[in-house]
């Protein structure tokens, strides 16, 4: 099993994201791409479409190929190395298939936080502990559909909520478009790495989709995202968003 080192955990705590290389074998990458191809056959990309194309398959009682893939890759065990040892990773109930079709020379104007538009039926924000992105295509170069992140913003967002109370997370009218709060962002960077890497990003980290500067003959970007909750997260979400490292080991 791939090991997340103490140095990598420190980088995640400080920066809010981590790219773990060489998690998937070539066979697992190929299997993941076959699953994506099957889903896109049912919900195809339109002829001539460029830019992002998303699918949001939910996992029912009968299971789902993307849940099987999640388990085969060992995403939970890997994410668990970031969490405190007394916390487990709950199985996700849906995934996001994120593709970017070139050419799409887009640059994000700013970041967002997930799960606020809309909130859940009871008004609770759809918070989670960590975003896991399984990279099925190479993202070793910038501007190939890479995720843009603003390092350290998870900590500043946490301070913002600690000062105003956790329910300020729902007051998007007080935030910048995105939505994301009016805090210091710093300079963004693009997450880079090879196919078979797994990206982890803190829930509060500022992020957004980037453009794909390739040609129409280049491969589309393919990532499978899973939004993961540590055990008990739903019950303590207010504590988690005001103390953003409380679920993670040092």
Per-segment meaning from a language model:
Residues 19-20, 134, 199-201:
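Short hydrophobic-aromatic micro-motifs
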Residues 42-51, 162, 195-250:
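Non-heme Fe(II)/2-oxoglutarate
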Residues 100, 150-157, 227-233:
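Short edge-strand/loop segments of extracellular domains
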Residues 107-116, 167-185, 214-218, 239-242:
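Short, surface-exposed loop/helix-turn segments at secondary-structure junctions
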Residues 119-142, 192-195, 227-230:
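Short, conserved beta-strand element in jelly-roll/cupin
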Residues 139-206:
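Double-stranded beta-helix
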